[in-house]
């Protein structure tokens, strides 16, 4: 009997490796791993999928697409979920889902499987994205169905010849892409515990960072980072280089108790050295170039966009509309930001732009001042007129 095909989002870890064996009972498994800049041994992952029973194994480099179509939205949208989390994992899920659906269409598969548990956000992100792209596709979540303990899963793996990962004893659950690294579980589950140094990988402890700062110039064109210290680079490469440079100076550590979509609170440790640096730089160029009303309104859009992406609604019309609005604001965001990296901080210390709305002759308090201070008298009268009228009415009522 010919089996149906299932497309499995494969990471090379224990959960998705066991899933191949488990799914093989009813399906021919096509394993797909997306390279979003996590730095894993992709050849090993490719071969491991075949070794444990997949009929096909695909490793797809999507770093550039991820950076240009997803990360750039987060950068230009200053998307911090709950004002702290730069949407590391949440950004990669819609792209991974899109690629899984494309491969399902190419291979004739009618089912997609993922390795998410039943208490995390990612199950929602994957399944809502897949349903948004092709409602006819069926989704299987083996880990959610098993409800096995870790010990039961290991026993199943041993009984079925699934290699046990060397890092299985690690207490942490880690997800990483070029925008950052997310870490949870183990000692981190108690929010009173300070995260130990072994919970970090991309950054040095700020107190152990170099005693001298380093400065980096970041060039932007239409809101897109295009160069570091004058060197033109693809966005993905630029982010990865900043991850290394800013990480050496302890930049980008985030300790966050967040409200998950599924209704629980979770303590997460994030490392986002490149993201934190770029977000600071981009914001400063916007501060130079956006008119006041837009600068004041845009954060409202940013907050709503952050929530939509975090909650797995990338392909929702509301998200698409907000992204379109966001893009319309970026044509004037051109210039250079100089960022000082020093012991855990990324501080913009200088900025310039040909589109700058900063007029030094208006801002200065020297003799070069061109601001007409006499105009302030009439402006204040008109601006304060509603408040004055209100006060007069209240005073009349109080008599």
From Swiss-Prot:
Positions bound to L-citrulline: 85, 121, 125, 173, 258, 270
Single GO term (MF): argininosuccinate synthase activity
Subcellular location, record wording: Cytoplasm
A GO-annotated cellular component: cytoplasm
Record GO biological process: argininosuccinate metabolic process; L-arginine biosynthetic process; urea cycle
Organism whose genome encodes this protein: Streptococcus gordonii (strain Challis / ATCC 35105 / BCRC 15272 / CH1 / DL1 / V288)
Amino acids binding L-aspartate: 117, 121-122
Keywords recorded for this protein, A-Z: Amino-acid biosynthesis, Arginine biosynthesis, ATP-binding, Cytoplasm, Ligase, Nucleotide-binding
Pfam families to which the protein is assigned, alphabetical: Arginosuc_syn_C, Arginosuc_synth
Pathway recorded for this protein: Amino-acid biosynthesis; L-arginine biosynthesis; L-arginine from L-ornithine and carbamoyl phosphate: step 2/3
Catalytic reaction(s) noted: L-citrulline + L-aspartate + ATP = 2-(N(omega)-L-arginino)succinate + AMP + diphosphate + H(+)
Subunit structure, interactors included: Homotetramer.
Protein name stated in the entry: Argininosuccinate synthase
Protein family per UniProt: Belongs to the argininosuccinate synthase family. Type 1 subfamily.
Keyword Amino-acid biosynthesis: yes
Keyword Repeat attached: no
InterPro entries: Arginosuc_syn_C, Arginosuc_syn_N, Arginosuc_synth, Arginosuc_synth_CS, Arginosuc_synth_type_1_subfam, AS_cat/multimer_dom_body, Rossmann-like_a/b/a_fold
Binding positions for ATP per the UniProt entry: 9-17, 115
Classification via CDD domains: ASS
Highest taxon of source: Bacteria
């Amino acid at each position: 009997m010919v089996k149906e095909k299932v497309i499995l989002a494969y990471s090379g870890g224990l959960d998705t490796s066991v899933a191949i064996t488990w799914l093989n009972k009813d399906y021919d498994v096509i394993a797909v791993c997306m390279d979003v800049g996590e730095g894993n041994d992709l050849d090993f992952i490719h071969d491991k999928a075949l070794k444990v029973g997949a009929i096909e194994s695909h490793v797809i480099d999507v770093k550039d697409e991820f950076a240009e179509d997803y990360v750039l939205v987060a950068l230009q949208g200053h998307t911090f979920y709950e004002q702290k989390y730069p949407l590391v994992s949440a950004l990669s899920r819609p792209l991974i889902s899109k690629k899984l659906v494309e491969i399902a269409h190419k291979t004739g598969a009618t089912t997609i499987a993922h390795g998410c548990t039943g208490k995390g956000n990612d199950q929602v992100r994957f399944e809502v994205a897949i349903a948004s792209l092709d409602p006819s596709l069926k989704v299987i979540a083996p880990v959610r169905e098993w409800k096995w303990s870790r010990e039961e899963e290991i026993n199943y793996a041993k009984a079925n010849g699934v290699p046990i990962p060397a890092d299985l004893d690690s207490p942490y659950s880690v997800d990483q892409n070029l925008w950052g690294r997310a870490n949870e579980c183990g000692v981190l589950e108690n929010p009173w515990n300070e995260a130990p140094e072994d919970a970090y990988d991309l950054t040095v402890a700020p107190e152990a960072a170099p005693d001298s700062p380093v400065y980096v110039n970041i060039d932007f064109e239409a809101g897109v980072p295009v160069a570091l210290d004058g060197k033109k680079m693809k966005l993905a490469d630029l982010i990865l280089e900043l991850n290394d440079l800013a990480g050496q100076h302890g930049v980008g550590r985030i300790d966050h108790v967040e409200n998950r979509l599924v209704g629980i609170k979770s303590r997460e440790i994030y490392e986002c050295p490149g993201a934190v640096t770029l977000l600071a730089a981009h914001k400063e160029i916007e501060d130079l170039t956006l008119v006041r009303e837009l600068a004041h309104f845009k954060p409202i859009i940013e907050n709503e966009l952050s929530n939509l992406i975090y909650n797995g609604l990338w392909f929702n019309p509301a998200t698409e509309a907000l992204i379109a609005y966001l893009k319309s604001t970026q044509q004037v965001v051109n210039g250079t930001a100089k960022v000082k990296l020093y012991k855990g901080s990324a501080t913009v210390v200088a900025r310039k732009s040909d589109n700058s709305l900063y007029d030094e002759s208006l801002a200065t308090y020297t003799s070069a001042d061109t601001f007409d201070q006499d105009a302030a008298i009439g402006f204040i009268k008109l601006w304060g007129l509603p408040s004055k009228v209100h006060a007069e009415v209240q005073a009349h009522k109080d008599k």
